[in-house]
Every structure is written in structure tokens, then in C-alpha cells.
Amino acid sequence: MSAIKTRFAPSPTGLIHLGNARTALFSALGGDVFVLRIEDTDLERSRAEFVAELMNDLRWLGLDWQEGPRGAEPDPDWYQSRRGEIYATYYRLLEEKGLAYPCFCTPLELEVSRKVQLGSGRPPRYSGRCAHLPADEVRRRHEEGLAATLRFRVPKDRVVEFEDEVRGPQRFAGEDIGDFIIRRADGSPAFFFCNAIDDALMGITRVLRGEDHLANTPRQLMILAALDLPRPRYAHISLIVGDDGAPLSKRNGSRSIKQLREEGYFPEAVVNMLARLGHHYDSAELLGLPALRAGFDIRRLGRSPARFDVSHLDHWQGLAVRGAADDTLWHWLHTETRAVVPDAHRAGFLDLVRSNCLFPKEADAWARILFTDELELAADIAAVAQAAGEAFYLAAIDAATESPDDFAAFLAGLKRRSGAKGKHLFLPLRAALTGSLDGPELAKIYQMLDKPRLHRRLAEFTYESE
């Protein structure tokens, strides 16, 4: 069996978000050779910095490509904006075959025609007004400098059929499509034209993309057939929706890969979440890319919308944090956090992070609670601490002095001296020492708080501190 070649072909007009990151992931998992192509024909919006960002995002996710550009400098092999001569050759071939023609209709004329068709209950498609202009009329209009698009001629009796690897048999009637634009009036190629040409010339054998591109497929298949170019297999994956059922957007939870990285998500967490958005894996464990690739089956891709839930992402983040090696976890922390953690408590602090934190900012908060004097108690937390009374804290100071290194002995001494137990013991103690009512085990906190700092925090709730 020949190698399956897939591709990811983003437009560098912004940052990569979850939807196109999942497309890239499924494309990488669903083939033997993964190609990156830059579709930058929108010259006004395409930016070199977005190319650099998307390459950085893909590499961070572990999705390196076997073929494609290695830098943001435009390369005619992989950047569509540099392949105009190639597309021009195929435009000429279509015109010579009589399968494409110039259209001089203005945007206003097309809009009027569209409204008339909609008003009469018909689906809007091109009327064919310029389809049979005499050659001398076409020449005259060109000489007058009239702008023209180039349209592909679609026979009304043409039927396009193909087997979608996700959605099954597909059938489109030519009369429902109409003659469509393959080159804009400014000379730039239409998306589905250069997209199809490049897929053929680059040997792409499987195209995985969002279901919103399904309607482009019959157009591309007609173009490829007209030019005797090979056609790939198509797999149109479900779209991602937010928790409100609407397409995922900034409004309902979408974030860029760059934003997730800056928030401290591990790439393994993002990849595992994306891999299960619309695809089933038997394993519920955090899987590496080799295991995800081994378990990927295009027949397991669902047709229903894939619902994004940030709690699922955070679940995978928790597994990634808990499974991270010490050195990885240490360098995941903010530089400022590492600076305040004493070497003697590094291993213990990392153990605390694994059990209690999802993000570096949370770890930073605990580092400052444990290793600095930056503790401030909110009014409700202070009220819990104060409710225990002065005698409780005097007893705690005595117990800590007696058992500075043994939390179990400290706790037994505090119980004996104060008579407190259960929540009346643990809640005020936690509130006074950490400024919180939940968090890491008190035994870990007791071991990491240096004893002068611990004594000062307990003394804050005695009359001696006033």
C-alpha cells in the first residue's frame, strides 16, 4: 500500500485556534507523510508573523511536518502567493478547452441577480450571462479595461459523486452549483482552485478538513477532472461547538494555541483533548503522539458536532501536570516562582504542585504563601481564623515549639492543649497559615513553612500580636 500523504494548509491571517489545530492534528495522525502549505493568497491580511506563529504552534504541539517550509520566508514550493505562474498555466489550459470563460458582471449585477433568484424561491447561482460572449466582444471589453473574473463552465447535466471517508456517499448536481469563479477580478486565484491544484501537484492523497468545506469538494473535483489531475480522498470532519451548541468562537470559549501555551497548558493536554473531539479512543490515559497515531482510525471520526468543554481540557492538564518529570515541571514554573522556592524544599514543592495546581500562576501563589511574607487574609477567611480564639493559637505555638519537624506530633499536641478537633481544628489552622480554607495537605504546608514564619502567622491571632 502506498504512503498516505496529508496536508495542513492554513491561511496566515491570524493565530491558530482550536478548530484548525484539531484539523492539523487529525491530518498528522491520519497519514504517513504530513505536509505544511501556506495559503497566503489574501495578500492584504496575510502576515509573515502569523506564519512564524503557526509554525511555532505546530512544533509546540509536536506536529512537525515532513514536507513544507522551514521558515517564514516565502518559498515558491510551499507559499501560494509565489505560485501564480503555475496557476496561470492551468487557467490557460481550461480556457483553451473551452471550460473557463471571462465574466464581466459587476458585483452589483450579481447581487441583483442573487436577490431575484432568492425572491422566486430558487437557490442562487450564476445566470450564465457571460458564458457565451463572442470572442470579439470579449476582446473589446478587455481592451476597454473592464475587470473580469474567470469562471469554470459547469454543464447543467453534470453530476459529481464521491465517497467521503467520514460522511459517506455524496452527490452534487451541476445545475445546483452553476458556473463558479476560479480567478478573481484582481487576478488572484479563488481558494478552491489553487487549493485543488496544489493538492494534486504535491501528491496529497487524503484531505482532512472541516465539514464547512464539503460544498467546495464538487467544484474541486470538476477542476481536477477537467485538467486530468489526480484526485485525493476527502474526509470532512465535524465542526467544534461551544457549550451553547454554537460554532466555537471567542464568545463561547475558543482560545488560540498561543494563548493556551502562555496560560501554562502542557502540549500533551491540548493534544489529548483535541484528539478526542470527534474521535473515540479506547484508552482514557494521557497518550503520546505515537500512541495517538496508532489508535487513530478515520472510521472512528464522528459526524455530529464535537462539543468543546474547558473542563475536559483541564482534566487532561491535570494528568499532564501529575505525570510531568521533575525537571519539566520545574521549568514550567514562572522564573519568579523558582526564585523564591528554597533548594531544600524544591522536591516537596513540586510534589505539592502536582497534587494541587493546574497552572503556573497557581503554583506561584502557593510559593509566595509558603516561602514569603506576602500573606493577606480576606475578611471571611480572617473571621474563620479569629473564631478559634486566642487560646487555640497559643496552644498551637506551644505545640509547634515542642514538635517543629513532626506534623503528627504537632497535631496531637494541639488537640491535647486546645481540645479542638475536626473542622474546628483544621479550618482555623489552615486559614491562619495559608489564608485559604482548602489546598495542599496541612502536613506538607507544616513541613515547608519555616518555623519563625509559622510562629508569626499563629501569633497574628493572639493578643500578644496587638
Curated annotation (Swiss-Prot):
The gene is gltX1. It comes from Methylococcus capsulatus (strain ATCC 33009 / NCIMB 11132 / Bath). SUPFAM superfamilies: An anticodon-binding domain of class I aminoacyl-tRNA synthetases, Nucleotidylyl transferase. Transmembrane segments: none annotated. GO terms for cellular component: cytosol. Keywords: Aminoacyl-tRNA synthetase, ATP-binding, Cytoplasm, Ligase, Metal-binding, Nucleotide-binding, Protein biosynthesis, Zinc. Gene3D superfamilies: 1.10.10.350, HUPs. Signal peptide: none annotated. GO terms for molecular function: ATP binding; glutamate-tRNA ligase activity; tRNA binding; zinc ion binding. This is Glutamate--tRNA ligase 1. It is found in: Cytoplasm.
